[in-house]
């Protein structure tokens, strides 16, 4: 079984870097819209997998729990409210549910496609860790790993390099997967502008 985890902050804290251009209510609506897009991409990808898959939203926010229920996916309560700790706990629960593979997708990937998610899984045939970096090649927008795995989650500053370094130190085969749609996230006002321009009808 494949477990797909989509971590999402509490809405009140999400997308704080966009506070200068979006009001709190607008940021919350954006987060929910992005999360729904990522859920849809993950769900569409499961049809191409060679084994069953389950999708979990990892969050402390009751609104995200409601989104999970409305979307027909599962919710893992985030009791840590720190991304790496939350994903470590999620990995335990996903592995206990019988998963042999875990895919982590950031919840703010407005362009991610089902093909991207499937590519993460397919790339594991020749690796123990597959990592999709952001546009700067520093952050981690998505990753896939075989379970069980000793790899620590190292999301945060320069996480792409730190994940690869940790995998190498553990003797794990790491592979980078770079696509424009996986690399694009909404972490600043310029990318928000680009996203809105692309969404605007011609």
From Swiss-Prot:
GO MF annotations in UniProt: GTP binding; phospholactate guanylyltransferase activity
Key words, A-Z: GTP-binding, Nucleotide-binding, Nucleotidyltransferase, Transferase
BP terms from Gene Ontology: F420-0 metabolic process
Pfam family, one: CofC
Function: Guanylyltransferase that catalyzes the activation of phosphoenolpyruvate (PEP) as enolpyruvoyl-2-diphospho-5'-guanosine, via the condensation of PEP with GTP. It is involved in the biosynthesis of coenzyme F420, a hydride carrier cofactor.
Other remarks on this protein: The exact nature of the substrate is currently not known. This entry has been annotated based on its similarity to Actinobacteria.
Official protein name in the record: Phosphoenolpyruvate guanylyltransferase
Species for this entry: Chloroflexus aggregans (strain MD-66 / DSM 9485)
Lineage start: Bacteria, Bacillati, Chloroflexota, Chloroflexia, Chloroflexales
